[in-house]
Amino acid sequence: MLNTLVSRFSAPGWAVALLWLTLLGVAPGCNSSSPEPTAVAPPTAPPPVAPPAPVLVGSSLIGEYTPAELAARVSNIPLVGSLARYSVRVYRLTYTTQNTDGRPVTASGAVLVPVAPAAVPVISYQHGTLQPDEETRAPSYYSSRSEIWSAVSVLAATGHVVSAPDYIGYGASKALPHPYEHGASLASASADMLRATREFCAQQKIGVNQKNFLLGYSEGGYATMALHQLLEEKYADTLPVTASAPGAGAYHKSAFARYIMNSTEPLNFLSTYVWVLRTYDRVYQLNRPLGYYYQQPYATRLQTDPFSAVPQQAAELFAPAFRQAVLTSSDPALSATLTANDVYDWQPRAPLALFHGTADDYVPFFNSEDAYNAMRARGATKVELRPIPGGTHFTAAPTYTLQAYAFISQF
């Protein structure tokens, strides 16, 4: 959406000069018995701000795909294929980012470039949860099983460059553990991929404008929210957010943890919460024995295989003392790790739409509702809550993609 330009007028140069002379006591036609003013040295100009160090390491072409090929990939979603206007070239990028310990690491991602005649916006697309045995679903492989293969490729074909980070732990950094649902590293890896994408476009003379849109669902929704916050805090001038549309993310981690520990219903997602706990224990150096978190025999099983099957009842899986510590916030270090990964309570400046299925039992709807209420309470005027009625975590995903595209198309 175009902004109205407002003209600004300044005083004519002679008036400014006269005012300056008057302030010095030497205005024309004025006599003064005051001593001659001491010459004042002009203020020293601030040193030039050094541009940020480049992050792009390398690139390689994966392939080029026609609108007809891309449309065929989404034939099961009505009308989506008709949006594909341009052929799309897909590249694999490697770039430098920081791991959770602050050390530099080479990461990777995919860039989807429409063969378009004019400069286009950039979408940063953050993918959802990938289990360790789903490595080849990471964006830089561009496999037919990846999120970016179908609908996201069509988004590129509408006239958007798409920046799709693998995240740490996949692609070029697959030897490292993925910091699952760790807000800070998901945000920095995504921001640095966005920087690398724009560096690549400049290098290859690919026309992009200044618009940056942020999309992602599930873990990608959480990463998108964390990325939006980071960009507005650290990159407001160089990577301004035009609009973002996170979907079904676990934004209110501390409340989500209490919800799990209070639940008496079967929870299908407990294995992923085990992964979150393992990540936070490692990243924040809590170094608790597994017996602190889990009852037997699951503590022993998870020691042997971190991704072994766990029961669906929280009371059966988690140690009673641990459950109580979460519910009463009686473990300050643990509580601090959860709060550090809350990304729901801040004031976004750019337009933000929160999409979430109302019947989501994997990442409950209250995560988006809490974010909306907290942001509005802080004075955010451009945040919207977009419920997907009756949608579960999985059935709402196609609707999210279509509605998120419609949302960003306004800007």
Please state what every model-predicted region is.
Residues 109, 227, 350-352, 364-375:
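Short alpha-helix in the alpha/beta-hydrolase fold that links the catalytic acid
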Residues 359, 380-400:
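Histidine-bearing beta->alpha loop at or near hydrolase active sites
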Residues 348, 353-360:
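Short beta-strand/loop motif that positions the catalytic acidic residue
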Residues 34-118:
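Catalytic-loop region of hydrolases
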Residues 247-345:
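Accessory cap/linker subdomain of secreted extracellular hydrolases
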Residues 113-116, 195-215, 236-239:
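Gly/Ser-rich "nucleophile elbow"/oxyanion-hole loop immediately N-terminal to the catalytic nucleophile
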